[in-house]
Amino acid sequence: YMQYDAENNNYSCTSVIFKSWKDDPIDSKGGVRCGKVIGKDKNQLSKAELDNQRDTKCYRLIYGLLSMDCTTADGQPTSIEDVPILWRVTGTNFKPVGESLKSLKSRGNLMQNHFLNLTSNRRKSGDTVWYVSKIAIDNKTVKFTKKDLETMDLFTDLITDENKRVSDAYHKANDKKETDKITAKVIDNLEDDPATILAS
């Protein structure tokens, strides 16, 4: 999960990278899912709260190697091969990617042993244009090499580092919340009867 702050043009909150929906995606602000409300709980929200929810999205993260024919900024044809990438998908691209990975798993195949051939379909609504991924799985099995293992280890290290960063921020935010509660309690007591507090 990531929460976008349009005013500052950055992500103000991120959750840990999790593998299962059963995991608890703690976030950098000391909460869960960057405040995203899911399921039936959405019915309890006001319109303003629902509008705020649009800034928080769940992303599917795909780590892999990219090979493609492409064009440079000045229009020259070129190509790249086996470049390590992180592909972040959400919205209309979330489901197609998930379905492709699920179909591999249901056949007993591992993602790292197959090429995923990507194209996109252009969509337009009014002035808004976006692209939806179209994924075709190459049924040919690709050999998993020592170099691939090194790249996978690199991805694992990146995930571990990111999750540690978010976890540290989560605990720090919760420690601050606890300190703020204690401070608020002391202030409340002072407001109730300062003479009693100062005499003790």
Name each region found by the language model.
Residues 146-200:
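Glycine- and charge-rich intrinsically disordered segments
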Residues 57-141:
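Extended serine/threonine-enriched, polar tracts that run as long, contiguous segments within proteins
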Residues 3, 10, 17-20, 93, ...:
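Intrinsic disorder/low-structure terminal segments
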Residues 1-79, 125, 176, 181-183, ...:
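OB-fold ssDNA-binding interfaces and closely related basic DNA-contact patches used
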